[in-house]
Amino acid sequence: MQTAARRSFDYDMPLIQTPTSACQIRQAWAKVADTPDRETADRLKDEIKALLKETNAVLVAHYYVDPLIQDLALETGGCVGDSLEMARFGAEHEAGTLVVAGVRFMGESAKILCPEKTVLMPDLEAECSLDLGCPEEAFSAFCDQHPDRTVVVYANTSAAVKARADWVVTSSVALEIVSYLKSRGEKLIWGPDRHLGDYICRETGADMLLWQGSCIVHNEFKGQELAALKAEHPDAVVLVHPESPQSVIELSDVVGSTSKLLKAAVSRPEKKFIVATDLGILHEMQKQAPDKQFIAAPTAGNGGSCKSCAFCPWMAMNSLGGIKYALTSGRNEILLDRKLGEAAKLPLQRMLDFAAGLKRGDVFNGMGPA
């Protein structure tokens, strides 16, 4: 690990008012989907399977959505994955319609990469605190103050913010891309997640200015409470998503994207894991490693009303009923201005090309910003 060349948090930036707690959102957000009973769920799944075939559609789901939706995606030849895997799958699949079960920026990313396809979502109001906390006008004004810096944005942003960037990254490839840019002597603006940005800054030593956004789920993890839980389970491996605060990351055995955490849970020989990310990932972890124990990392503290509230209220808006509605009505479609989509595709495609290069081992062969 390297010492960061420059710690950020030293610039003027407008205070963006976003919800501060996943608990608060769940308590106030009436549209969080109810879990259907078994009979209703089975009926909806059968109807959706038929609709997917009739409409030449495929279901692409994130690890954080309802397990019923995750299982349905796999049963119908779709995809369950992290943001990078979802983007790859949608771009490569032959289906004319993509049903994206996740949050809005994921649907937008699918439309950016596949403008010729119809992209539907179970609920267009499924937002993301990182996206909401990084409005395009304010972020662009900040970037304009530092014209000498390369702009790197997390995938959890709007199409308009992506269009302002030089690079888009997911947590799966953020470290590698920033390391590459640092090797070229580039100074960076990073947005919007301050915890992920600070982690990358510490790991790479890159010169980064950080936007001050955060994920309302990962921001709730508490280092003190995690340390206490770790003391209760000294044999447990601690898996942490890098959107978590530094005090939590410092207690981790593995830091990484949802896919990396899932791989560690399955491949490592240990039998007990403490997991600091959205609880939705536990479904796939338990499926792939049924002989292992998974413990949710604590979010209690600062008045928290539950020991672990780590699930995204907007991801919870995705439902089987919403998928059926989108397929039968043709509504809940992601629509983007053509020029905006083209501008946003450049940095997003740059990431996908870089990620493909990682697999080939030739990531340094001319894949810098155009």
From Swiss-Prot:
Question: Where is this protein found?
Answer: Cytoplasm
Which GO BP terms sit in this record?
'de novo' NAD biosynthetic process from L-aspartate
Q: Offer an example of a GO molecular function term for this protein.
A: 4 iron, 4 sulfur cluster binding
Q: How is the cofactor bound?
A: Binds 1 [4Fe-4S] cluster per subunit.
State its cofactor. [4Fe-4S] cluster
User: What positions does the entry give for [4Fe-4S] cluster binding?
Assistant: 128, 215, 312
Family annotation (InterPro entries): NadA, NadA_sf, Quinolinate_synth_A_type1
Task: Give the record's GO CC terms.
Answer: cytosol
Protein keywords? 4Fe-4S, Cytoplasm, Iron, Iron-sulfur, Metal-binding, Pyridine nucleotide biosynthesis, Transferase
Top-rank taxon of the source lineage equals Bacteria
Q: Briefly state the protein's biological role.
A: Catalyzes the condensation of iminoaspartate with dihydroxyacetone phosphate to form quinolinate.
Q: Which family does it belong to?
A: Belongs to the quinolinate synthase family. Type 1 subfamily.
Q: What name goes with this protein?
A: Quinolinate synthase
Q: Which organism is it from?
A: Neisseria meningitidis serogroup A / serotype 4A (strain DSM 15465 / Z2491)
Instruction: Quote the gene name from the UniProt entry.
Output: nadA
